[in-house]
Amino acid sequence: KSELLNNQNLNININLNVKDIINIDELNNLFLKLEIESGDIKISDSYVTWKDDLVINLNESLINYDQGEIFLTGRINVDIKDTNDFYSSFQINKKFRKKIKEIQFDFNYNFSKEKISFDNLVIDQKKDNNIEEFINNFNLNTQVLNKVTFKNFVNEFFKIYFG
């Protein structure tokens, strides 16, 4: 919150490769491309692997400081390699386990409030009205994002999409 990095004269390019992320067993192979240019903090063209099932690509992302709060805004593209293991890990009901290859969405994460909102969600290059309504309702909710709320979100997401 000090805005130390928000300096018009500061330019940094960092590429960070992390094989294993400690205390988060499921995430590995993190590649983080951090660019600070004239005070803008960008984290684009980065990715992380969830087990060997998903590749989560972070695109067009920007960290900004606005009215005393820090936000990460961007686009995520999730490439799904193994749906079965993913569904098992999140204990998705078997009747809601169908093949999907890709999920794309925009997001805005408020670090100060630990809240996230989603927009423009596309599954296998198609929009779904039921999912749009689900996302809009989720965004109106004031719950803090944590492991439990995330798991519940994922379960409800697939229940609505394939239900």
Q: How would you describe each model-predicted region?
A:
Residues 1-163:
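Membrane-proximal interfacial segments on either side of biological membranes
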